[in-house]
Amino acid sequence: MNRFSKWITDFLRPPKEARLDLGRRAVIGAGLAGVGGKLLFGVAPEASRRTFNPALIRPPGALAEDDFLARCIRCGECMKVCPTNAIHPASLEGGFEGLWTPVMVTSLGYCDYECNLCSQVCPTHAIRQIEVAEKQKIKIGLAYIDRSRCLPWAYSKTCIVCEEHCPTPKKAIWFEEVEVRNIQGEKLTVKQPRVDPELCIGCGICEVKCPVKAPAAVRVASVGESRNPENQILLTNDSYGQG
């Protein structure tokens, strides 16, 4: 290689500090996108209403959405300590303001009933510190049965997996014995699962353990979460008819 060619090669070669691997570059870019979105769009008034999404399930102890977005610095500490891989960075579940903030993805992991680690490591208290006993009473969402996919409902097959794994002291998933007929016209008694919205905390273990996959026959949505009294599936006597 002559001196001119070497000079051209050296000139075109990026500096060492610019040679990032794609994995690191993606992580840094995503982090900057989250921070940039926060700076560019800010936390809009009543962001939680405007960006409501059933998939926007925050970890237990998360503040009300506007306060949460104002405090969360997208550090990822809660994601790192989650033992069941349930907490992941948000894409657009919470709008641009919520980029890279932590959300529960209950198709991938569940909130362990005996765990409160995410609340212990949050440096800004966007997820407030809570003891396990308090955490166990916080509703982060509500499970619901997809009757078109559930084995007892759709196929008259016996399955009690969701109820077996439900961790609440009084099971949030219970069964009703129903007499049905199979395709041959024979009478069968099957146990069809139901969800008690008063007892369900939305932990997602039923979704993870469900033998039906992609998607599961029981899934969790953010409706019913403790942190937002307006995000409820049921009308109470006090709220009925009020604007």
Where are the regions a protein language model picked out?
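Non-ligating segments of multi-cofactor redox enzymes
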Residues: 1-243
